[in-house]
Amino acid sequence: MAVSRATLFDKVWDLHTVGTLASGQTQLFIGLHLIHEVTSPQAFAMLRERGLGVLYAERTVATVDHIVPTQSQQRPFADTLAEQMIRALEDNCAEFGIRFYNIGSGSQGIVHVIAPEQGFTQPGMTIACGDSHTATHGAFGAIAFGIGTSQVRDVLATQTLALDKLKVRRIEMNGSLHPGVFAKDVILHIIRKLGVKAGVGYAYEFAGTTFEAMNMEERMTVCNMAIEGGARCGYINPDAVTYAYLKGRDFAPQGADWERAVAWWENLRSDPDAQYDDTIHFDAAEIAPTVTWGITPGQGIAVDEIVPRPEELPGEDRPLAEEAYRYMDLAPGVPIVGTKVDVCFIGSCTNGRLSDLREAANLARGRHVAPGVKAFVVPGSERVKRQAEAEGLHEVFLEAGFEWREPGCSMCLAMNPDRLEGRQLSASSSNRNFKGRQGSASGRTLLMSPAMVVAAAVSGAVADVRALLEPTP
């Protein structure tokens, strides 16, 4: 265990250090490896080329999520490449003895949804996955990295990664959030203020009373988008909220093992006098419902603000802003409220969990999607879908004019049939608004909370969700 004055990151890093490589990098043991159908086929092929096997199949969990259709999931898929990729994962998992949650298993879903909900993700773990948003698992006090295909191969073969140790930045936020402000607004606000490159070389520790008051699914939303602020990973110290979420889940410790685990997890928390490379403070009361207007997650504004004028921006931000004005067809100085939307999407590893769907359904109840708007809800997993239907949430969405889909990554990245067409503009609860991200080379994306997506869907345009919270006269 690291000495006192250590952060959780330091403690977990030290506990998982195998050695120091000639390059100066740390060889880090990976406790849990999550794989899916897109970044694993080439990794398995590289194993076979070298005559290698999977070192710890029991520490590997697989599912299909990126390319699966969310309307009909009847096999074989119409998309032959998608069918081939899923068959490859089926075959690879069978050959190497890897636990695999396929469509129809009852537990399939987005990889960053299924691992926490089943209790695979636990405090103090090191976790890797061939997906950018692996930082999601940091919500549990784990250190989780998104990795590339060659690194997927390395973890399969050696259960280790070669990594440079990160600096640690404490993002401290205190205070209560106003009604209509959600975890998604919090992380969009942080990225807006710090920028998309500020976290390069850092792990972000999210701390303070605001994060302590969040439930686990809200914390996952925050950590999920740490990468969008440039951070390699983000995490929150485990606490009673963490333990209450984990207790009794399929792969969480049971009985006496549970008590020992909680005692161990408590020791992993950052020490009260931990030394950080720097600390940045935020006031939760300053955050309003937030929406992106541009082509990076850092180009965000409060919903009641105007699209920023170039002269109001730092000089280094102006070229990208000019590019965003042209691509998004938004004029500087104009309110973002009232911007017409074509598609409204609720889902993704950022906001496709049960609490997200409950909040969205509460706002959709008694309202209806505006004419000309396509709106759909994609549960993050088969378990989320099953529970949402048990609560009747799907009926609320259907009555309000939303489509109710099968689990998958869906329009977050459009490696599946869920895509924008032409210059369509989407209100999306996902995590990236890059050019072409949602399937059309000219499609446009506004990132926002699921509640804000509902407000846009029923209004037919960007709208302030706080108006939906006001009592009807």
Swiss-Prot record:
EC number: 4.2.1.33
Keyword Zinc-finger attached: no
Record: residues binding [4Fe-4S] cluster: C349, C409, C412
UniProt KW keywords: 4Fe-4S, Amino-acid biosynthesis, Branched-chain amino acid biosynthesis, Iron, Iron-sulfur, Leucine biosynthesis, Lyase, Metal-binding
GO MF entries: 3-isopropylmalate dehydratase activity; 4 iron, 4 sulfur cluster binding; metal ion binding
Pathway linked to the protein: Amino-acid biosynthesis; L-leucine biosynthesis; L-leucine from 3-methyl-2-oxobutanoate: step 2/4
PROSITE patterns: ACONITASE_1 (PS00450), ACONITASE_2 (PS01244)
GO biological process, one term: L-leucine biosynthetic process
Cofactor binding note from Swiss-Prot or TrEMBL: Binds 1 [4Fe-4S] cluster per subunit.
Subunit note: Heterodimer of LeuC and LeuD.
Cited NCBIfam families: leuC, PRK05478.1, PRK12466.1
Biological role stated in the UniProt entry: Catalyzes the isomerization between 2-isopropylmalate and 3-isopropylmalate, via the formation of 2-isopropylmaleate.
Designated name of the protein: 3-isopropylmalate dehydratase large subunit
Source species: Gloeobacter violaceus (strain ATCC 29082 / PCC 7421)
